[in-house]
C-alpha cells in the first residue's frame, strides 16, 4: 500500500526514534483494531473450546485463595508453606476474581495486539504490517500455556511503550508500575526492550533519562520486594533452551546488522542474549522463564526480515522456520499435554478427598504425584488438604530436588523425603504425570516403594507411608491441632525445642515461645511450658526492615 501524505498544522506525535510518523493515524488505528479483534476472537476459541493451559490450575487455585481469604502473604497448603502473591503478581488475582480467568485472558490478549500494532506501525510504518498480524495470531495462542499474569503484564508493557512513543512520560510511569505489579517477568522483558532502544538511540540521551529513571526506580522496588520476601527457590535452565535462545539472538543480530531502520531491534537481540546468558550462569527463581520472548519469536523475526525486504530469500525462509518452531513448540506441547489429562474435573479427585477427610489429621500432609495438568494442586488444597508440592516449580528447589534426579528415585531416599515433610499419604492417579513425577510414579507402581496401598478406585490410588513422621516432633508428645493458610496451632505435652515441618519465614510469630530457622529451612519452636501455641504470619514494618537487612527479627513471645 503506498504511503498517503498528510498535511497538518500540528506536529506529529514523537516515536521512539523521534522521526515523523509515516502513516495516517486512521490507517494505524484501523489495522490495530482489526488485529485486536482477530487476536481476541482466536483467544476466545482457544480459552473456551480448547484444553486448559498448562498453568491454568495454578491460577485457578490462587484465584480461589484470593476469593476466600483476600490478599494473603502466606499459604501453608503448598510446598510446606510459601509466599502467595507478593512476589508473583499483585494485581492479576484481584482482577481475575472480578472478571474471571478466561474473560480477563481474552481482554488482555486483545489489548496487547492493539498496542503492539500501534507501536510497530508508528515506528516502522507499513513494513510492520505482517509482523502485526502474525503477533495477533501467535500471541492469542499463549492462552494454551496458561501464562495469564505474564499476558496481562505484557499488555501493560506494550501500552507503556505506546505512551512513551506519544511523549507522555507520566502515563509511561504509571503503566510501567502496573506492568511490574502484574508480572515482574513482563517488567523485566520491558526493561530489556527499553535497554535495547536506549543503546540504539544513545545520541538522544536527554530524552531517555526520565524513562530510564522510572525503570530503575521500579526495578529497585521489585528488588526490595524480593529481598523482603525471599524464598530461596530457583527455576531450572537447561543448556538446550539456552542454545535455542542463542541461535535466535545471533541470527536476529546478524539479519539486522547494517540495516539502519532495524537498529533498535538489533540491540534488543544483543541485550536479550546477554540477559539470558546471565540467567543461565546465575541460578535464581528466574531461570528458564527469561526465554518468554520466544512467544513472540515469529512476529519479531517477520519484522526483522521485512526491514531487510526478505533478502536473501533462502536465509529468510530458514530463519522464519526456526523462529516458528521455537515460538510454537512449547504451545503445541502444552496443548497436547493438557488435552490428554483427564484430571481436570473435581469428580476425578472426589474419592481421594473423601478418603483423606476421613483419615488425615492436621498433624500430617499429603503428597500428590503431580499430573501433567497439575490439577492435584487445585482440588486437594481447595478441600483443606495440605500438600508437599503444588504448582510453582521454583518452590520445588531445593526441598523437592530429588524428584528431578536423572539417576532415578530410590526407596530409601524417597521414604526419607516423605518423613522429612510430615507426609502421611501419597495420592497416585492414572493421569499422565508431570515430568518431575515420572520416577515417583514408577517407584510406586513397582511395589518396591515400601508404602502400602490403602485405597483404590478406577482412577486414583492412595498409599500409606510406613511409620510416618508428624509435622511436629520434639522431646515430648506433640500434635498439630489446627492448620489454615497463614496460621498453625500446635499442642505440646512437654517444654523444649520442637521441629515443625513448615518453612520458616521472618514473619512467623508465636503466641508463646521462640522461633528459629533450622538448617533444613523448617521452623524450630522453643516452647517454655506445655500447652497450645499458635503461630501466625505478621507482616509489619519492623520485621520487614530486619528482613531487608538480613537480620532475624526477635521471635520470642511470652
PLM region descriptions:
Residues 309-328:
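Signature aromatic-anchored transmembrane alpha helix within multi-pass, membrane-resident enzymes
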Residues 51-58, 62, 69, 73, ...:
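Transmembrane catalytic cores of multi-pass membrane glycosyltransferases
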Residues 1-44, 557-558:
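Start-transfer (signal-anchor) and selected internal transmembrane alpha helices
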Residues 330-558:
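Extracytoplasmic
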Residues 43-130, 134-154, 184, 342, ...:
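Active-site lumenal/periplasmic loops and adjacent helix-entry segments of GT-C-fold
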Residues 22-23, 114-128, 161-169, 193-211, ...:
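Cytoplasmic membrane-interface segments at the C-terminal ends of transmembrane helices
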Amino acid at each position: 500500500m503506498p504511503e498517503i501524505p498528510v498535511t497538518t498544522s500540528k506536529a506529529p506525535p514523537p516515536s521512539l526514534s523521534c522521526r515523523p510518523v509515516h502513516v495516517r493515524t486512521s490507517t494505524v488505528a484501523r489495522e490495530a483494531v482489526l488485529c485486536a479483534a482477530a487476536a481476541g476472537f482466536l483467544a476466545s476459541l482457544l480459552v473456551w473450546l480448547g484444553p486448559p493451559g498448562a498453568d491454568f490450575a495454578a491460577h485457578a487455585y490462587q484465584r480461589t485463595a484470593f476469593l476466600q481469604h483476600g490478599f494473603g502473604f502466606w499459604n501453608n497448603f503448598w510446598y510446606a508453606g510459601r509466599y502467595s502473591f507478593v512476589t508473583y503478581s499483585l494485581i492479576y488475582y484481584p482482577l481475575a476474581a472480578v472478571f474471571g480467568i478466561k474473560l480477563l485472558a481474552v481482554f488482555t490478549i486483545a489489548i496487547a495486539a492493539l498496542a503492539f500494532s500501534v507501536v510497530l506501525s508508528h515506528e516502522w510504518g507499513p513494513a510492520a504490517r505482517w509482523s502485526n498480524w502474525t503477533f495477533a495470531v501467535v500471541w492469542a495462542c499463549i492462552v494454551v500455556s496458561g501464562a495469564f499474569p505474564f499476558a496481562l503484564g505484557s499488555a501493560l508493557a506494550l501500552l507503556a511503550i505506546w505512551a512513551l512513543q506519544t511523549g507522555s512520560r507520566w502515563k509511561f510511569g504509571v503503566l510501567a508500575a502496573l506492568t511490574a505489579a502484574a508480572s515482574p517477568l513482563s517488567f523485566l522483558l520491558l526493561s530489556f526492550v527499553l535497554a535495547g532502544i536506549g543503546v540504539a538511540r544513545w545520541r538522544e540521551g536527554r530524552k531517555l533519562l526520565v524513562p530510564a529513571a522510572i525503570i530503575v526506580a521500579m526495578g529497585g522496588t521489585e528488588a526490595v520486594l524480593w529481598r523482603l520476601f525471599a524464598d530461596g527457590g530457583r527455576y531450572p535452565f537447561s543448556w538446550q533452551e539456552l542454545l535455542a535462545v542463542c541461535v535466535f539472538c545471533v541470527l536476529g543480530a546478524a539479519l539486522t546488522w547494517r540495516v539502519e531502520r532495524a537498529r533498535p531491534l538489533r540491540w534488543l537481540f544483543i541485550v536479550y542474549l546477554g540477559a539470558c546468558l546471565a540467567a543461565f550462569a546465575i541460578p535464581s527463581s528466574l531461570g528458564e522463564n527469561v526465554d518468554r520472548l520466544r512467544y513472540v519469536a515469529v512476529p519479531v523475526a517477520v519484522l526483522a526480515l521485512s526491514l531487510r525486504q526478505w533478502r536473501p530469500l533462502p536465509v529468510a525462509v530458514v530463519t522464519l522456520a526456526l523462529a516458528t518452531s521455537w515460538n510454537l513448540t512449547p504451545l503445541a506441547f502444552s496443548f497436547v499435554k493438557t488435552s490428554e489429562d483427564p484430571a481436570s474435573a473435581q469428580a476425578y479427585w472426589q474419592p481421594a478427598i473423601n478418603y483423606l477427610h476421613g483419615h488425615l489429621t492436621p498433624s500430617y500432609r499429603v503428597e500428590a504425584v503431580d499430573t501433567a495438568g497439575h490439577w492435584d494442586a487445585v482440588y486437594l488444597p481447595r478441600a483443606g488438604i495440605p500438600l508437599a508440592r503444588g504448582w510453582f516449580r521454583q518452590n520445588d528447589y531445593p526441598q523437592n530436588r530429588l524428584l528431578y534426579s536423572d539417576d532415578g528415585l530410590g526407596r530409601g531416599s524417597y521414604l526419607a523425603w516423605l518423613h522429612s515433610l510430615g507426609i502421611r499419604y501419597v495420592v497416585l492417579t492414572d493421569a499422565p504425570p508431570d515430568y518431575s513425577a515420572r520416577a515417583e510414579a514408577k517407584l510406586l507402581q513397582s511395589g518396591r516403594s515400601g508404602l502400602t496401598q490403602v485405597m483404590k478406585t478406577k482412577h486414583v490410588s492412595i498409599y500409606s507411608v510406613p511409620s510416618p513422621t508428624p509435622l511436629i516432633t520434639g522431646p515430648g508428645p506433640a500434635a498439630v491441632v489446627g492448620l489454615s493458610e497463614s496460621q498453625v496451632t500446635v499442642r505440646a505435652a512437654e517444654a523444649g525445642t520442637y521441629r515443625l515441618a513448615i518453612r520458616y519465614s521472618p514473619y512467623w510469630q508465636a503466641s508463646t515461645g521462640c522461633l528459629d530457622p533450622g538448617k533444613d529451612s523448617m521452623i524450630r519452636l522453643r516452647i517454655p511450658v506445655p500447652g497450645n501455641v499458635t503461630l501466625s504470619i505478621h507482616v509489619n514494618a519492623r520485621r520487614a526492615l530486619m528482613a531487608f537487612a538480613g537480620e532475624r527479627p526477635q521471635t520470642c513471645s511470652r
